[in-house]
């Protein structure tokens, strides 16, 4: 049984996911955590009653070994580590929705303080790719930025949605770190510097990421799922009714391999095998876990796993010895395991009893009479599954239809479908009433996104009189673009927006790609190039035209820029295309973007004006306060009252101005997100180097406020003529 080697109770509440540990003087490890009052506390039990100079840091009135760092804003992310290798000690990085602070705790001074327009939702510190100096990488409003120790912006790119989690991991085994990004659009993206090298789609918002070892990493979702990936392959995952607040990799059983440590919202901490997800250790706190870190907190040469709760309770655990391996859990946990095994035993005994009763019934009854009740079906019974596109009717919207049928007169009593990202809870049960039983069932499926999905099916097959059923299991993949129906050619419906590119592939290979990614009717015959196919979206009725010429030139007509990007990325993956330059034009979308850019300029102007007004008000407040105090000292009560009335009015104006600034900032963030997403979409229309060039050139055009150049880059992929 593994017990904590130390326990602390700090009188400060800790914000979830905002705990870090660092050697801020180069020697002593100290905990840093954000509070809910716009402060960061630093717990240093090694040098008590240390003198603190007057700056951001002041001594906590509650505890002598806790110093408080005033941020005066809600802290949104926090980490610690070596930012400047020449200093020889760690820096503290604190992010808010408007700024990033790099703080030198030892000298009580700012390393840099940068305004970040896209906010900082997540932060990670380390080296990325071939960039030699350590970077503080922040993820915000669809954007990623990396700053060195001087505050210089050395890395910038965009991603598909608001960033929630970041981690650095050697994903491809080349000895250099790649950036893992988890975002609100359920995707985990892997950046090799500014190039996306892999994408994994999950079922919910990705809230946490952590490197395990090599190319293996852990992840957590907002629906209570935690798991482990090795590159793009998921090893395992489990789902809990509680939320995973923090995950961390730590070798708790001393077997040389890191386990996945998870802190939960109900106060539980558990350690799971990286290979199987089996729980090897767990403990409970009285409140939710805020963060999990590691460090030699006792300065005895041994690294401890340090778990912190939101109420300020801190426990440190030493890894188990070789003798304790496999016995890290307490007796209550072992009793839980015994109960679980007993339940499995009961289930097996019940199954055995069913077999025995079947055998007795077979001896006591004529064969045919007993068959139906026992669920015996013909040996040649087969389960058939087909996928097709249904345009819907008055009572049902358009959908993809899954038809499940048997090969004889047996009936399907129930169907269980397990699929990620389609059904609530990832499962769906179809259980027809006793009067509607038949040998086939049609199930409507409406995937919300264009991603391939594996449907895992379990069908209960028997006869109407059966009390026991045979279970058929099957797996069927839903194609990526299953929500698009093949339609007849209609030049009048051709969208004006298009992308155009050339690939060195035979037309027949493109036909194979179409067959794998769309649900084409069985009687569909596509002639050799040149040819054209037309589809209609089942979601919004939008049109999609794909034209292929003999030369390998492909034109895709659609008004949906996201769909065009998905098709290009799908083709690039199928045909193993490394670099692809594309010409694109989306007039309606570009006009909407132009309006957004005008709004961004307007909101920036309003922000500057409001800031100037606030500065003027601040100067006026000083003069009014001095005047009011002078009048009080001179016992001129009438003038004093007049000055304080003016102060009251000025204070009201300041509050109103603050509300306007908040609304203006919210609107500005929304429009900046739209701009960043537009750059990301323009990048997704290309592959490889052209993609990176478009993203970089778009950012340069926005920096120089050259809107016409921006749209030219989005259309042709370059600013040069």
Swiss-Prot record:
Does the keyword Transmembrane feature in the UniProt annotation?
Answer: no
Q: Which tissues is it found in, per the record?
A: Widely expressed.
Alphabetical list of Gene3D superfamilies matching this protein = YVTN repeat-like/Quinoprotein amine dehydrogenase (2.130.10.10)
Q: Chief localization class?
A: membrane
Q: Does the keyword ATP-binding apply?
A: no
Residues annotated as coiled-coil are 325-369
Name a single GO biological process. negative regulation of gene expression
Quote a single Gene Ontology cellular component term: motile cilium
Q: Where in the cell is it found?
A: Cell projection, Cilium membrane; Cytoplasm; Cytoplasm, Cytoskeleton, Microtubule organizing center, Centrosome, Centriolar satellite
Keyword terms of this UniProt record: Bardet-Biedl syndrome, Cell membrane, Cell projection, Ciliopathy, Cilium, Cilium biogenesis/degradation, Coiled coil, Cytoplasm, Cytoskeleton, Disease variant, Intellectual disability, Membrane, Obesity, Protein transport, Retinitis pigmentosa, Sensory transduction, Transport, Vision
Give GO MF terms, alphabetically. Answer: RNA polymerase II-specific DNA-binding transcription factor binding
What disease is linked with this protein in Swiss-Prot or TrEMBL?
Answer: Bardet-Biedl syndrome 2: A syndrome characterized by usually severe pigmentary retinopathy, early-onset obesity, polydactyly, hypogenitalism, renal malformation and intellectual disability. Secondary features include diabetes mellitus, hypertension and congenital heart disease. Bardet-Biedl syndrome inheritance is autosomal recessive, but three mutated alleles (two at one locus, and a third at a second locus) may be required for clinical manifestation of some forms of the disease. Retinitis pigmentosa 74: A retinal dystrophy belonging to the group of pigmentary retinopathies. Retinitis pigmentosa is characterized by retinal pigment deposits visible on fundus examination and primary loss of rod photoreceptor cells followed by secondary loss of cone photoreceptors. Patients typically have night vision blindness and loss of midperipheral visual field. As their condition progresses, they lose their far peripheral visual field and eventually central vision as well.
On subunit structure and binding partners, the annotation says:
Part of BBSome complex, that contains BBS1, BBS2, BBS4, BBS5, BBS7, BBS8/TTC8, BBS9 and BBIP10. Interacts (via C-terminus) with BBS7. Interacts (via coiled coil domain) with MKKS. Interacts with CCDC28B and ALDOB. Interacts with DLEC1.
What does the protein in this record do? The BBSome complex is thought to function as a coat complex required for sorting of specific membrane proteins to the primary cilia. The BBSome complex is required for ciliogenesis but is dispensable for centriolar satellite function. This ciliogenic function is mediated in part by the Rab8 GDP/GTP exchange factor, which localizes to the basal body and contacts the BBSome. Rab8(GTP) enters the primary cilium and promotes extension of the ciliary membrane.
From the Swiss-Prot or TrEMBL record, give the protein name: BBSome complex member BBS2
Organism listed in the record: Homo sapiens (Human)
């Amino acid at each position: 049984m593994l017990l904590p080697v130390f326990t602390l109770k700090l009188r400060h509440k800790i914000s979830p996911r905002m705990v870090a540990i660092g050697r801020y003087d180069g020697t002593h490890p100290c905990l840093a955590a954000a509070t809910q009052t716009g402060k960061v506390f630093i717990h240093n039990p090694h040098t008590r009653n240390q003198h603190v100079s007057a700056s951001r840091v002041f001594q906590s009135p509650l505890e002598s070994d806790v110093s408080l760092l005033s941020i005066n804003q809600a802290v949104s992310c926090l980490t610690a580590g070596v930012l400047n290798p020449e200093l020889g000690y760690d820096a503290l990085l604190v992010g808010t929705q408007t700024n990033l602070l790099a703080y030198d705790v030892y000298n009580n001074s700012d390393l840099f303080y940068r305004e970040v327009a896209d906010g900082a939702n997540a932060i990670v510190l380390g080296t990325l790719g071939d960039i030699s100096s350590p970077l503080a990488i922040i993820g915000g409003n669809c954007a990623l930025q990396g700053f060195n120790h001087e505050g210089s912006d050395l890395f910038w790119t965009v991603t598909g949605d608001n960033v929630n989690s970041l981690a650095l991991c050697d994903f491809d085994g080349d000895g250099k770190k790649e950036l893992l990004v988890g975002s609100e659009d359920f995707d985990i993206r892997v950046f090799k510097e500014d190039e996306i090298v892999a994408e994994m789609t999950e079922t919910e918002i990705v809230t946490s990421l952590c490197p395990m070892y090599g190319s293996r990493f852990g992840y957590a979702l907002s629906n209570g799922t935690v798991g482990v990936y090795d590159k793009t392959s998921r090893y395992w995952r489990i789902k809990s009714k509680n939320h995973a607040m923090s995950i961390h990799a730590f070798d708790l059983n001393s077997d040389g391999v890191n386990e996945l440590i998870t802190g939960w919202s109900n106060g539980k901490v558990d350690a799971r095998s990286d290979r199987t997800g089996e729980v090897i250790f767990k403990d409970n706190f009285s409140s939710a876990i805020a963060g999990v870190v590691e460090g030699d907190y006792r300065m005895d040469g041994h690294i401890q796993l340090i778990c912190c709760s939101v109420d300020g309770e801190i426990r440190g655990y030493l890894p188990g010895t070789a003798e304790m391996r496999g016995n890290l859990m307490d007796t209550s946990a072992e009793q839980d395991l015994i109960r679980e095994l007993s339940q499995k035993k009961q289930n097996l005994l019940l199954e055995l009893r069913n077999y025995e009763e079947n055998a007795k019934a077979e001896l006591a009854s004529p064969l045919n009479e007993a068959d139906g009740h026992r669920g015996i079906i013909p040996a040649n019974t087969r389960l058939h599954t087909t996928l097709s596109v249904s345009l819907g009717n008055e009572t049902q919207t358009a959908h993809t239809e899954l038809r499940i049928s048997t090969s004889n007169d047996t009936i399907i009593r129930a169907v269980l479908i397990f699929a990620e990202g389609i059904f609530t809870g990832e499962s769906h049960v179809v259980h027809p009433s006793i009067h509607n039983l038949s040998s086939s069932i049609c199930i409507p499926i409406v995937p919300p996104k264009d991603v391939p999905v594996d449907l895992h099916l379990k069908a209960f097959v028997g006869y109407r009189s059966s009390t026991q059923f045979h279970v058929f299991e099957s797996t069927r993949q839903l194609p990526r673009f299953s929500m698009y129906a093949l339609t007849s050619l209609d030049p009048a419906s051709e969208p004006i927006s298009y992308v155009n590119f050339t690939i060195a592939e035979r037309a027949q290979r493109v036909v194979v790609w179409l067959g794998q990614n769309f649900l084409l009717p069985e009687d569909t015959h596509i002639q050799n190039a040149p040819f054209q196919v037309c589809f209609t979206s089942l979601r919004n009725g939008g049109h999609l035209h794909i034209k292929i010429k003999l030369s390998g030139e492909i034109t895709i007509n659609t008004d949906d820029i996201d769909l065009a990007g998905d098709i290009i990325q799908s083709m690039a993956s199928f045909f193993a295309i490394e670099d692809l330059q594309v010409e694109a034009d989306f007039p309606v979308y570009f006009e909407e973007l132009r309006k957004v850019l005008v709004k961004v300029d307007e909101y920036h102007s309003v922000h500057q004006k409001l800031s100037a007004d606030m500065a003027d008000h601040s100067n006026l407040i000083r003069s009014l306060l001095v005047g009011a105090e002078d009048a009080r000292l001179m016992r001129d009560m009438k003038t004093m009252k007049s000055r304080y009335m003016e102060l009251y009015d000025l204070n009201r104006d300041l509050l109103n101005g603050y509300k306007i600034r908040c609304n203006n900032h919210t609107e500005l963030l929304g429009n900046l997100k739209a701009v960043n997403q537009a750059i990301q979409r323009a990048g997704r229309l290309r592959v490889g180097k052209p993609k990176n060039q478009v993203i970089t050139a778009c950012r340069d055009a926005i920096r120089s406020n050259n809107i016409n150049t921006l749209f030219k880059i989005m259309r042709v992929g370059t600013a040069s003529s």
